[in-house]
Amino acid sequence: MMTAAARPSTVDVVCRDESGETVVQVVAGEHPLTVYVDRREVLTLMTLGAAPEALVLGYLRNQRLVERIEDVVSIQVDWDVHAASVVTRSGLVDLDERLAHRTKTTGCGSGTVFGDLMADIDAIRLPPEGEFRQSTLYALGERVRHHETIYKQAGAVHGCALFAPDAGLLYFVEDVGRHNAVDAIAGMMWLDGVEGHDKIFYTTGRLTSEMVIKAAQMRISCLVSRSGLTQMGLQIARQVGMTLIGRAVNRRFLVLNDPGRFVYDVSTTPTAAPATSAPEGR
């Protein structure tokens, strides 16, 4: 049983522009949401509030606090007290010990991962099967570019999207932190029974170790960002066998890691350098 407690993603703020004129500016929302599991406080998330139940569920999944969705009895979000109450079927094992080994990440909004996730990642090897075509990369980039987003209205948010192998858009989520957006998509996938092995995950944020770990936990083998990456993000992608593509803007991109899935199927013509005139003689 879950509530449907989405909050408005933006608010209107009256301000003055560079000419001193009064204007109305759209601003991204941001709200604290404290997560309680079986009446135990786990953490407080700073979130846009657009998909709070999916966010909480995805967080529990990606942190391996809950192994099966059947173990979750209910998620109740109450914005009057800024709290999400999760009830599980049989409680969480070793919660105190796990809470004591949280690692603060580089994600916007101060994300955290539990220390044992770094050990769990050693057991993950993504299957090498499947293709990710250059034409598919371009198609999903176009879908993102034309998608109506909070970022276009207000800025100040990150976006994540999950695509089918044919570049069909399955989910698109924005939040004040990219780790929130990926957790919300993880929650939606879990609720809908969507498997990740043949999907493509897109993010506007940089490819940090946290992003790669979460994608690997979701069994996603192809991760794309319009931004760059960190050394540890690349290291983990190599370890688990993930296709990693960064700096994907318009028709430019960098294949940062690929165990053989990526297929170049679009001919590209190098742009000729502009002609330069010879310097005038003196």
Task: Please tell me what each predicted stretch does.
Residues 178-268, 277:
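Feature captures the catalytic cores and cofactor-binding loops of soluble hydro-lyases/lyases
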Residues 50, 177-178:
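A short acidic/small-residue loop/turn micro-motif
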Residues 1-165, 169-172:
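Intrinsically disordered, low-complexity regions enriched in acidic/Ser/Thr/Pro/Gln residues
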Residues 273-282:
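Long, low-complexity, intrinsically disordered segments
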